[in-house]
């Protein structure tokens, strides 16, 4: 008799999109149409919004493709906004694997008006996305803990990942998951290039012999997430 066999574990597990990926083509087309029909003085505004959304979705497609190609039995939410008793925030991809809950956000290009920015008397603006990723992961971890879907000792299983085009191919390599220096309990944010996200998943979210987040535990997590979705 296998003393370690978990009866509740399904024999065949597969990728499940709880909130499916959406290429947001309707939004993109609406912005494009508005740029063609709007008053001349508004054209640049709509063209910029259209270009930025199209570029953003292209990056999201790379990550969605990596999730599918990995072949891992993941549970995934795409572009989900959560509001809890403590805070609110949008998660681009929320991925639940056998042992980790991955909060994926995308690094944005910061627009700096250099002609109005005098570097002689001020520091360069600091990128805030790493802290924002950890803050969002902390919000989720706290909410899951309040709803008894995670114990206080399991908060470090919530891992924030920041997708950054400027990272190199080595960003997919498995790194030791360290504790956040700012937020209690959760893991430190990792920065990963979108092109190698599939490899990152395979190295960090592999199928576990003794999975934690399956069956009833997985349902408790998804129930808690669903309660917070707006």
Predicted features and spans:
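Surface-exposed interaction regions that form or flank ligand-binding interfaces
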Residues: 1-89, 96-102, 110-230
């Amino acid at each position: 008799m296998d003393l370690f066999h978990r009866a509740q574990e399904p024999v065949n597990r597969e990728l499940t999109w709880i909130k499916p990926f959406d290429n947001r083509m309707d939004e993109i087309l609406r912005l494009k149409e508005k740029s063609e029909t709007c008053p001349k003085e508004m054209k640049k505004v709509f063209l910029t919004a259209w270009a930025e959304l199209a570029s953003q979705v292209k990056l999201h497609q790379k990550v969605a493709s990596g999730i599918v190609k990995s072949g891992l039995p993941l549970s995934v939410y795409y572009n989900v906004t959560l509001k809890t008793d403590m805070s609110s925030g949008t998660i681009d991809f929320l991925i639940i694997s056998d042992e980790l809950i991955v909060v994926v956000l995308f690094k944005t290009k910061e627009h700096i008006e250099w002609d109005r920015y005098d570097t002689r008397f001020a520091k360069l603006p600091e990128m805030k996305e790493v802290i924002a990723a950890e803050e969002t992961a902390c919000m989720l971890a706290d909410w899951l803990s309040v709803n008894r879907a995670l114990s206080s000792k399991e908060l470090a299983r919530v891992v924030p990942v920041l997708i950054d085009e400027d990272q190199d191919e080595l960003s997919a390599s498995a790194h030791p998951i360290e504790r956040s220096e700012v937020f209690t309990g959760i893991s430190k944010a990792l920065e990963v290039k979108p092109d190698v996200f599939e490899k990152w998943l395979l190295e960090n979210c592999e199928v576990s012999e003794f999975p934690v987040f399956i069956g009833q535990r997985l349902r408790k997590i998804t129930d808690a997430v669903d309660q917070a979705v707006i």
